[in-house]
Regions:
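Transmembrane helix-bundle signature of multi-pass secondary active exporters and lipid flippases
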Residues: 10, 33-53, 84-88, 117-125
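Interfacial/gating helices of multi-pass transporter permease domains
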Residues: 3, 21-41, 107-111, 171-176
Length: 200
């Protein structure tokens, strides 16, 4: 259920950003921003989701049997995920240079959004590792609630930021809001994991 709430809150704030953006940008700009965000999220979850599906149940099962081994596996997975997500970020940054020329003129202008979004995969990786695998797989009902609360806080922060950045920076501001929100999630997940790191 906390995982569902996290997905729901993420979906809500990302859709709300597009709605707010509609008051300040043309449909063409919104389309380019949305394309850039979809490219970023597709690359992130194409890589992160399989890793999570493989290691989440292993860590969760192991935490009930041998806590020290579960934490050891968590540490190894953390290094793997963060390394891979950093590579994804570099790939997004690099692709921002040549993607418009490959896909055509309709995609010109995506580069600036993709360069901002290039910072997001690492933050998503941090939030995923410390949140899903740390607070949930290694945790208990209490830490699952903390996981849920992080996304509520992030959604509120996102709403506040979008009314600050979007009116002045339009789609660039929206890209900053998305990236900043994922950074907020990552920081709060690390904080809560460190706070409850002895739960297992």
């Amino acid at each position: 259920f906390p995982l569902f709430l996290s997905s729901a809150s993420t979906s809500i704030y990302t859709q709300l950003i597009v709605i707010v953006l509609g008051f300040y940008c043309t449909t063409e700009v919104i389309g380019k921003y949305s394309s850039a965000e979809r490219i970023m999220r597709a690359m992130c979850f194409l890589v992160y989701t399989p890793l999570n599906q493989v290691f989440f149940p292993k860590i969760s099962t192991l935490s009930a049997k041998n806590c020290s081994e579960a934490h050891s596996l968590f540490g190894q997975v953390r290094i793997l995920v963060l390394t891979v997500m950093a590579i994804v970020g570099v790939a997004i940054w690099t692709s921002s240079i040549w993607l418009p020329s490959v896909l055509g003129e309709d995609y010109s202008g995506l580069d600036i959004y993709l360069k901002i979004f290039a910072l997001t995969p690492f933050a998503i990786g941090v939030g995923g590792v410390y949140g899903q695998m740390g607070l949930i797989a290694l945790g208990n009902e209490h830490t699952s609630h903390r996981f849920r609360d992080v996304y509520f806080i992030a959604a509120i922060a996102s709403i506040c930021m979008m009314f600050i950045f979007i009116p002045f920076l339009q789609a660039i501001g929206a890209s900053i809001v998305v990236t900043a929100t994922e950074v907020v999630v990552a920081i709060l997940m690390i904080y809560n994991y460190k706070k409850f790191s002895k739960i297992c």
